[in-house]
Amino acid sequence: MRLLIGFALALALIGCAQKGAESIGSQKENDLNLEDSSKKSHQNAKQDLPAVTEDSVSLFNGNKIFVSKEKNSSGKYDLRATIDQVELKGTSDKNNGSGTLEGSKPDKSKVKLTVSADLNTVTLEAFDASNQKISSKVTKKQGSITEETLKANKLDSKKLTRSNGTTLEYSQITDADNATKAVETLKNSIKLEGSLVGGKTTVEIKEGTVTLKREIEKDGKVKVFLNDTAGSNKKTGKWEDSTSTLTISADSKKTKDLVFLTDGTITVQQYNTAGTSLEGSASEIKNLSELKNALK
């Protein structure tokens, strides 16, 4: 009996020792993880701070460029920046933050940042491990953003975000001037769909026999048209460039004005029964259904 009791006590002591060792090992592992995390946080914070020998330049889009206070042996200023935890380096003749910086990721893909001489344009490009460009993003200080994706060195999709927040998106792209699908999104999530042909974007929306069409030139100039295939009581539309207004008429009488404002919204205002003057006040079209109702 004493032998059994002694054996049981020995097993219990061994179990306690193992648990204690596991606990210590687990604690050490946690301490190492915390230490590693702390080091990474410190390194990331350090990357976002200028060294004693650097000046910091804050760009309009939130990026920071660190510029050496003195020129290097080649007579240029050294540049440094961190984008998506990738450290980029480069040189420049100027010390204002402009220039080109490059860096590599662990998978050998690359990131390239170009800041224009006037600091008003920032271009971010991504390359795969074989050095083929896969995407680019051009951000301008006035507010527009152009994003492109490429496949096998060919343009695959493109998105233009205007300074007012409205967008133009292209997919199934043949070349820079032609795309099978184009989508324009105005304020209030109003979408018009079409295509890009010969550099001109044509998007439209249909309601019954009426088609509202927007033509957008390369330079961004817009014209709006209205077409009606009805046999009788056909609607017509007249576009006025100076006011960005489409006046809709039926039976030779003006019925309403659609105004395409610079902020990307559309307003509608009715004419009186005689069609001679506007009445009431213009109201903002809040969704696609309201726009379709305005075309009825």
Curated annotation (Swiss-Prot):
Q: Name one cellular component (GO) term.
A: cell outer membrane
Q: Fetch the Gene3D superfamilies from UniProt.
A: 3.90.930.1, C1 set domains (antibody constant domain-like) (2.40.128.160)
What range does the record give for the signal peptide? 1-15
Where's it found, cell-wise?
Cell outer membrane
Q: Does the keyword Thylakoid apply?
A: no
Name of the protein in question: Outer surface protein B
Q: Which organism does this sequence originate in?
A: Borreliella burgdorferi (strain ATCC 35210 / DSM 4680 / CIP 102532 / B31) (Borrelia burgdorferi)
Q: Which SUPFAM superfamilies match?
A: Outer surface protein
- Look up and give the membrane topology term: Lipid-anchor
Provide this UniProt record's keywords sorted from A to Z.
Cell outer membrane, Lipoprotein, Membrane, Palmitate, Plasmid, Signal
